[in-house]
Amino acid sequence: MTPSLKRLSGAMRARPAPALSGTIKAPGDKSISHRAFILGGLAKGVTEVTGLLESDDVINSGRAAAALGAKVEHLGPGHWRIDGCGGQWTTPSAPLDFGNAGTGVRLMMGAVAGTGTSADFIGDESLSSRPMRRVTDPLGEMGARFTTTGGRLPAHLDGGPLAGIHYTPPIASAQVKSAVLLAALGATGTTVVHEPQITRDHTETMLRAFGVTLTVERDGAAATVTLTGPQTLIACPVDVPGDPSSSAFAIVAALISPGSDITLEGVMDNPARTGLIETLKEMGADITLTPGPDMAGEKTMHIHVKHSQLHGITVPATRAPSMIDEYPVLCVAAAYADGITHMPGLEELRAKESDRLAGSAAMLRANGVPVEEGEDSLAVTGMGIGGVPGGGRTVTHHDHRLAMSGLVIGLGAKAASSVDDIAMIATSYPDFFDHIATLGGRLEPLT
């Protein structure tokens, strides 16, 4: 079922770029793509998906759905057909291997628990170091029986009946909320998830598209989601919109490269995902948004970006859930701003594919940018356009977003910058190299 993916590995260098220009179509959204495989695999009927992000992480979710009994077919670039199981997974013959996909494994834990199926969940070294109790604990309250390795992978799930719960996640996490809601589809009774701080709502939107009845009540920055089970998903077409998190790299590259003028087409426009654009505009970015067509129940936009003189700001901690994946590349923008950019409320970055808070600070220091690292904060002293020395090498710690950020910082620096490995970029954005090259960026493999 797997298409051929672009495979590049080893160190890479980014040279200072001339003005970036041109138009690219944003890559398919990773969050929507994961959910398309999981919901399509669980649904009754055939789900046809277009625009799917064919990255390593997403493909691992597709493989898991196939191992659980769904029929998954690749019809062409980004085009897939999923014949679902009608709410009845089959016990897989081998562990479900999610590689580096935290979203995939956490959501699938909920989806499998809700069907009463038993399964083993494994991942690579990076994923196996990430916390899973944030998902297994609430699923356990519903009746799922997990055995984990110190709260991490490998994990075993013994299938059994579930009951609805009222749950307030201790952290703002769309993955936790989604795992509970997916389990609630097969649970008896009503499940209520109360979010003190609203997170991305793709699961709620897509569940409705698949015929699920649920309610969402918002109260300021909080939200309460209510779902009564059991319910069966009914297959529907999914046209995946562009990924705001992946689009961030080209946006920042254009902002820091004098004379640049680029457009990204078809990017998802969801308030729970647009925190970076809001932040960059507050920093002085020349960004124009034009409405695009609705896709997968989401609004989209075309983003026009021109090189800009940026200035430091304080990013509200309450904005972190809407841009948690974009902080490494925001650090790049902050490096080229005038003044200090303060970023509080970043404790969740410590538990990503790597310690992204420490990794982002190390990337900046390696390239001559002053930064203060707190327990849950960063303060970046910007050096202005053309003022970043560059010349450093970013240690990626197998983290795709650190790798891409470590390359973008070199596009506007005085000297070329490099990263120690690029192999993991395929987990989220296999077209990154082609897109940057199309816009005029200079990326060179190092031997």
UniProtKB/Swiss-Prot annotation:
One of its GO terms (biological process) is amino acid biosynthetic process. SUPFAM superfamilies: EPT/RTPC-like (SSF55205). Its EC number is 2.5.1.19. Phosphoenolpyruvate binds at K30, G102, R130, Q175, R356, R401. It is found in: Cytoplasm. Keywords: Amino-acid biosynthesis, Aromatic amino acid biosynthesis, Cytoplasm, Transferase. PROSITE patterns: EPSP_SYNTHASE_1. Pfam families: EPSP_synthase. It comes from the Bacteria. GO terms for molecular function: 3-phosphoshikimate 1-carboxyvinyltransferase activity. Pathway: Metabolic intermediate biosynthesis; chorismate biosynthesis; chorismate from D-erythrose 4-phosphate and phosphoenolpyruvate: step 6/7. The active site is at D325. GO terms for cellular component: cytoplasm. 3-phosphoshikimate binds at K30, S31, R35, S173, Q175, D325, K352. PANTHER family: AROM/DEHYDROQUINATE SYNTHASE, PENTAFUNCTIONAL AROM POLYPEPTIDE. Monomer. Belongs to the EPSP synthase family. Catalyzes the transfer of the enolpyruvyl moiety of phosphoenolpyruvate (PEP) to the 5-hydroxyl of shikimate-3-phosphate (S3P) to produce enolpyruvyl shikimate-3-phosphate and inorganic phosphate. This is 3-phosphoshikimate 1-carboxyvinyltransferase.
